[in-house]
Amino acid sequence: LRDGDRSRYLGKGVTKAVGAVNGPIASRIQGMTIGSQLEFDELLLNLDGTPNKSTMGANALLGCSMAFCRAAAQSRKLPLYRWIAEIYQPAVIGILPVPLMNIFNGGAHALNGLDFQEFMVVPAGAPSFREALRMGAEIFHHLKVVLSGEHLATTVGDEGGFAPNLDDYENKHEQAFEFIVQAVESAGYKLGKDIFLA
């Protein structure tokens, strides 16, 4: 939910969303005992009452949901990732967290004509978060080399991934994936083993 007031942050301000948090959301949840993350999220969705979260704003609802989740983790003296794993997938606690790294942008956050919003790499084959982060960063830098080699722009989109214009390619969406595959291989990793795409 954005304010739409062009005199503040060119219309991208979020005082309406903040007002929803401090107003109707706060009024509804103050003093409540809420048993689970699912119950809290359902309460927020019902309070908004729209399929696309347009009343309160996805930014307000997500912020509240995340705050509830963090508070629940802190009350149990657990790291956030471990708490989320216990809620949703207790069997995979040993391999979390695995970052999803946005390395190629399209959609509304890039002016390159790609329909997909984000092309991500998932270094799920890494033995630790530290190694996963390193793998993702190396792939990102290799992707810059791949794009430069094709004489494509290496500026980044709003979400931090590269956002070159691929209109000269017959199938620009497949080409975006092909560039990512080249970067993964150039970095020395194997798709489907070390790295997955999302």
Question: Across the structure, where does each feature detected by a protein language model lie?
Answer:
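Residues on a specific face of well-ordered alpha-helices
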Residues: G23, L62, M66, R70, ...
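Flexible, glycine/charged-enriched surface loops at secondary-structure junctions
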Residues: G35-F40, A58, L80-W83, K144-G161, ...
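Structured core elements
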Residues: T55, G63, N102, M120, ...
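Mobile "lid/hinge" segments at catalytic clefts and subdomain interfaces of large enzymes
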Residues: Q89, G94-G157
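Metal- or metallocofactor-binding catalytic centers and their adjacent structured scaffolds
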Residues: L1-L78, I87, L133
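Short, hydrophobic/aliphatic alpha-helical segments
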Residues: L38-K53, G63, Q89-L100, F140-H151, ...
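Active-site pocket-lining segments that scaffold enzyme catalytic pockets across diverse folds
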Residues: C64, N171-G188, D194
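Conserved short loop/turn motifs at secondary-structure junctions
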Residues: D158-H173
